[in-house]
A protein has these predicted regions:
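An N-terminal-biased, well-structured beta-alpha scaffold segment characteristic
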Residues: 2-95, 217
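Short beta->alpha connector loops at strand-helix junctions that form conserved
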Residues: 32-33, 53, 75-76, 91-103, ...
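Rossmann-like adenosine-cofactor binding region
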Residues: 56-63, 175-271
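Phosphate-binding beta-alpha-beta segment of Rossmann-like dinucleotide-binding domains, i.e.
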Residues: 90, 98-146, 150, 158-165, ...
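Oxidoreductase and adenylate-handling cofactor-binding alpha/beta cores
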Residues: 106-125, 145, 164-168, 298-311, ...
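Hydrophobic/small residue at the entry helix of a nucleotide-binding pocket
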Residues: 155
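A conserved regulatory-domain signal marking ACT and ACT-like small-molecule sensing domains
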Residues: 321-533
Length: 533
């Protein structure tokens, strides 16, 4: 008997049939692939859910036309093709499958290591050309070699476990992993430069952020052993591709395996294509296994089914588990919590062991858990980028050994709408920031390390701690002016005259590393931190 559903789901990219069968349990499923934006806008208003892969662009215009839409499901990890902020504003849940391709991506990195070590692609090409080059392609064993893992998340951890089972010694760089967690994995934590100097193989498992873009450049490559090899199956843009090509040609390193690129597809004139030996290239195949495609389809289809049945989603990219009314009411507070978390992480540096949230005044009357999640998302996203969302932030914090404490003080009346204070404790000391939401939803930073300030957050900021003495503000302003850095705003907070003070500058452009060193060199300045919000 044909079942009729009031609920409709649009599948606009090719999805594994296992996912379609799950959706068929609760909705009418229409599969229409290859739609243009205008075509999608023309039909999306009829649908309660949309399931996509990377092909469909879910723009603000598409979301505006989706008057019935409750959920967008991305069968995969990345959601760059979805306007998540607009979806959040419209109360549309966005979900993905952050773990569905973990094994596939990890195994591809390992396959790259083995292919590089035994020259598999080049030997195969020689056989196809009629050659028998046994001497030319003498390789190396992985056994008893040192593997350096940059990023000990789910994928990096799986690579580490398999590598250990093959007899490799594993070292890792991940400032957000607790030492005891690494010890449980029998992985030695080290600094990034030490890892590159020591490792025979380096595998990258980090997101692309402002801090990781071109992280692996010519200078870092020159610190590696000439016999070392590097693999990137994480995100394009974290390695300088021209520098990689040159390093292999000049014998600075023995080889590289790349699956992802700064711009995809890889340009025909890319210098990587001209490297004849020691380089293995694949066209972004990390998640391209039958099992991974089935896993992500099932995972996301189950989440869409659950949401349509009124149940929570397990991998929401935007705020989960809140009604549209509560979400709208708390939106400025959650934005403040995320901003403070992002700010304090950049001030703290190093590994944060504990984060304490102090809810004061009216803030104490609101549900605390959404604020905790938002704060953790901010705290971790400075290093982990878009891989952190409102669902996995708590899990990622727990995996990194970060303890969360909550304190509520409804009696506090420092601001009409209350305030939120976040304190971190870690291997580089304690840091504290406080903020409030003013009239009209305006966010304000009201104290830093107990120094009172009144600062509106901006995209680029510079924080300093200095001695309160004549001339420092003028020297800093002159230095920034000499380097063509425009100051948009400035606040100074102090407790006593001519004691210690903090200075907060809103600036129009990021501070380059060389300029930051010059700032720190000013007499009386004790520390300086550039912050991106």
């Amino acid at each position: 008997m044909l079942r009729r559903f009031m609920t409709k789901v649009l599948v606009s990219d090719p999805i594994d049939q296992a996912g379609i069968e799950i959706l068929n349990q609760v909705a009418q499923v229409d599969q229409r692939t290859g739609l243009s934006e205008d075509e999608l806008i023309g039909i999306i208003g009829d649908y309660d859910a949309l399931m996509i892969r990377s092909g469909t662009q879910v723009t603000a215009a598409v979301i505006a036309a989706a008057t019935k839409l409750k959920i967008i499901g991305r069968a995969g990890v990345g959601v760059d093709n979805v306007d998540v902020p607009v979806a959040t504003q419209r109360g549309v849940l966005v979900v993905n499958s952050p773990e569905g391709n973990t094994i596939a991506a990890a195994e591809h990195a390992l396959a790259m290591m083995l292919s590089l070590s035994r020259h598999v692609p080049q030997a195969h090409a020689g056989m196809r050309d009629g050659r028998w080059d046994r001497k030319k392609y003498v390789g190396n064993e992985l056994y008893k070699k040192t593997l350096g893992v940059v990023g000990l998340g789910k994928i990096g951890s799986h690579v580490a476990r398999v590598a250990q089972s093959m007899g490799m010694e594993v070292i890792a760089y991940d400032p957000f992993i607790a030492a005891d967690r690494a010890q449980q994995m029998q992985v030695q934590l080290t600094e990034l430069d030490a890892l590159f100097r020591t490792a025979d193989y380096v595998t990258l498992h980090i997101p692309r952020t402002k801090d990781t873009e071109n992280l692996v450049d010519a200078d870092l490559l020159r610190t590696m052993k000439p016999t070392a090899r590097i693999v990137n199956c994480a995100r394009g843009g974290v390695v300088d591709e021209s520098a990689i090509a040159e390093a292999i040609r000049e014998g600075v390193i023995a080889g590289a395996g790349l699956d992802v690129y700064a711009s995809e597809p890889l340009a025909e004139d890319s210098p990587l294509r001209a490297v004849e030996r020691g380089l293995v290239l694949t066209p972004h195949l990390g998640a391209s296994t039958e099992e991974a495609q089935e896993n992500v389809a099932i995972d996301v289809a189950e989440q869409i089914r659950d949401v349509l049945l009124g149940l929570p989603a397990r991998s929401a990219v935007n705020i989960p588990g809140l009604s549209a009314e509560i979400m709208e009411r708390l939106k400025p507070n959650l934005q403040l919590a995320e901003t403070l978390g992002l700010l304090v992480s950049q001030l703290a540096g190093g590994h944060v062991k504990e984060m304490e949230l102090r809810f004061q005044g009216e803030f104490a009357s609101h549900p605390s858990q959404p604020h905790v999640i938002a704060s953790l998302k901010g705290l971790l996203s400075a290093a982990l980028g878009d891989s952190i969302n409102y669902v996995n932030a708590s899990l990622e914090a727990k995996a990194r050994g970060i303890q969360v404490l909550e304190v509520k003080d409804e009696s506090s009346r420092d601001f009409a709408g209350g305030s939120l204070q976040i304190t971190t404790r870690g291997d580089q000391g304690n840091r504290s920031v406080t903020g409030a939401v003013f009239a009209g939803g305006e966010l304000r930073i009201t104290s830093i390390d107990a120094y009172p300030v009144n600062v509106t957050p901006s995209s680029h900021m510079l924080f300093t701690r200095h001695r309160d003495m004549p001339g420092i503000i003028g020297q800093l302003g002159s230095l920034l002016g000499e380097h063509n850095v425009n100051i948009a705003s400035m606040q100074v907070g102090r407790k006593i005259v001519r004691g210690d003070a903090v200075m907060v500058l809103g600036i129009d452009d990021p501070i380059p590393a060389s300029l930051l060193q010059a700032v720190i060199a000013i007499e009386g300045i004790q520390e300086a931190h550039p912050v991106a919000l």
